[in-house]
Amino acid sequence: MQSITFTRPDDWHLHVRDGAALAAVVPHTAERFGRALIMPNLRPPVTTTAQALAYRDRIRAAVPAGLAFEPLMSLYLTDNTAPDEIERARASGAVIAAKLYPAGATTNSDAGVTAIDKIYPVLERMEACGLVLCVHGEVTGGEVDVFDRERVFMEKILSPLVRRFPALKVVFEHITTAEAAQFVRAAGANVAATVTAHHLLLNRNAIFAGGIRPHHYCLPVLKRETHRVALVEAVTSGNPRFFLGTDSAPHARSTKEAACGCAGCYTAHAGIELYAEVFDAAGALERLEAFASLNGPAFYGLAPNADKITLVRESWSVPAGFPYLDDDPLVPLRAGESVGWRLA
């Protein structure tokens, strides 16, 4: 197969930052995707519906003319989130999810939830009104090995949460392990997961190939090859509760190539093409459309996009960097290397 045409995909987990950084990265996503669920971990975080609507306006202003891209918004949950804010979010029609960040788990998560029981009233309201809970599934205690954070989170927090709120729609974001994939398969229809392209393409050896590779450092961290293989099997299986979420996370080069570098891989420049590589290598290109374009909208109760895109089997070279901040470029995944599929 030399080309594939399918329903325009959506990105169900995206970071676009704000200000000049936002203007630099939004076009990459808008060229490929019809919609994206925007993560709320700005500094300060997006904790109210009013803030989310203002942020949506700033994103819309950065969409190039002629592209019909729609940002879908989320709220950042804190220990102090009010249940009434959930009602406002749901009523807005623009905010479709709220994000649980365990405090300290990832970039700009220091304002996150310190104990899950502190947000039980909020989760009850979300369950009642149908707002989706998106979860960064890692514990943060120093006694837990960084490669075990996802597994321990499932055992201590996610499993009890799903039992306590059986009608709450939950997305286990950017899963990285065979155990997480199995958790989703075994759960009810109200539990789904996003999977990133980099966790499907890379294992943890990529962080240390010939030296420290800061542009392969993300959270949750890359895992063993056995887990990567299990994730590929999950996304190509046809199970409708796995769908595309790039977790594309832009950082200036100086903050990645540093003594204490930021976590995140930037993939929006090839946000659908990298997934095509994965499905092609697995002999499952015919299942890419469901994963990228159909499963996510179905879970969120939305219609698929009306238009289509075409990918061509044609190699292209990824630039060494993209303009980002003044004299501080953005280094994308595969910088200086090639991608095997191209957006027509």
From Swiss-Prot:
EC number(s) in its UniProt entry? 3.5.2.3
Give the pathway listed in the UniProt entry for this protein: Pyrimidine metabolism; UMP biosynthesis via de novo pathway; (S)-dihydroorotate from bicarbonate: step 3/3
| Required cofactor(s) | Zn(2+)
Q: Which reaction does it catalyse?
A: (S)-dihydroorotate + H2O = N-carbamoyl-L-aspartate + H(+)
**Cited InterPro entries:** Amidohydro-rel (IPR006680), DHOdimr (IPR004721), Dihydroorotase_CS (IPR002195), Metal_Hydrolase (IPR032466)
N6-carboxylysine PTM positions: 99
Q: Name one GO biological process term.
A: 'de novo' UMP biosynthetic process
Molecular function terms, GO-annotated = dihydroorotase activity; zinc ion binding
Keyword Zinc among UniProt keywords: yes
* Residues binding substrate, per UniProt: 15-17, 41, 136, 219, 251, 263
Q: How many cofactors are bound and how?
A: Binds 2 Zn(2+) ions per subunit.
Q: Which GO terms describe its cellular component?
A: cytosol
Q: Which PROSITE patterns does the UniProt entry name for this protein?
A: DIHYDROOROTASE_1, DIHYDROOROTASE_2
Q: So where does Zn(2+) 2 get bound?
A: 99, 136, 174
Q: What class of enzyme is it?
A: hydrolase
Recorded family membership: Belongs to the metallo-dependent hydrolases superfamily. DHOase family. Class II DHOase subfamily.
* Cited PANTHER family: DIHYDROOROTASE
General function of this protein:
Catalyzes the reversible cyclization of carbamoyl aspartate to dihydroorotate.
Quote the HAMAP family the UniProt record gives. PyrC_classII
Protein's name according to its UniProt entry: Dihydroorotase
- Organism of origin: Azoarcus sp. (strain BH72)
Q: What is the lineage of its organism?
A: Bacteria, Pseudomonadati, Pseudomonadota, Betaproteobacteria, Rhodocyclales
Gene expressing this chain? pyrC
